Curated annotation (Swiss-Prot):
Subcellular location: Plastid, Chloroplast
Quaternary assembly: Part of the 30S ribosomal subunit.
Biological process per Gene Ontology, one example term: translation
Sequence similarity: Belongs to the universal ribosomal protein uS11 family.
Gene: rps11
Protein name, as recorded: Small ribosomal subunit protein uS11c
Pfam families named among the record's database cross-references: Ribosomal_S11 (PF00411)
A GO molecular-function annotation: structural constituent of ribosome
Family matches, as InterPro entries: Ribosomal_uS11, Ribosomal_uS11_CS, Ribosomal_uS11_sf
Cysteine disulfide partners in this protein: none
Annotated GO CC locations: chloroplast; ribonucleoprotein complex; ribosome
Length: 140
């Protein structure tokens, strides 16, 4: 005869305390990834193992259209991402920058002003060895 599978009641699952796992972690060291394209800037903060702690983009911070690629949007994006992880105890970080957008320097300045000590700063911009054909010049 087959054993019956015991199921928990939905009442028990509903009254469980809800708490975010990401805010409970303490992360003293981390990696800040800055991806600066011509149209947007994305800042992702991970722990040393590579698990994402938080991320922010210029579009998610309220900038729309052309303003997403501006240095001010990149600065605001970096400040929002860093503010979250500083409250979780991060005080040392490695910064990896990728892309050639206008916001990369502004995002880096915002990270330096935040009080997080930089252990390493590395440029990870992919350089083609004459790969894909670039988009044509814009005529205005």
């Amino acid at each position: 005869m087959a054993k019956t599978i015991r199921r928990y009641s939905s009442f028990r699952l509903r009254n469980r305390r809800i708490r975010s796992r990401k805010s409970a972690r303490k992360i003293p060291k981390g990696i800040i990834h800055v991806q600066a394209s011509f149209s947007n800037t994305i800042v992702t903060v991970t722990d040393v193992g590579g698990r994402v702690v938080t991320s922010a983009s210029a579009g998610a911070c309220g900038f729309k259209g052309r303003r997403r690629g501006t240095p001010f949007a990149a600065q605001t994006t970096a400040e929002n991402a860093i503010r979250t992880v500083v409250t979780q105890g991060m005080h040392r970080a490695v910064v990896l920058v990728k892309g050639v957008g206008r916001g990369r320097d502004a995002a880096l300045r915002a990270i330096l002003r935040s009080g997080v000590r930089l252990h390493l700063l590395r440029d990870r911009t992919p350089l083609p060895h004459n790969g894909c054909r670039p988009p044509k010049r814009r005529r205005t």
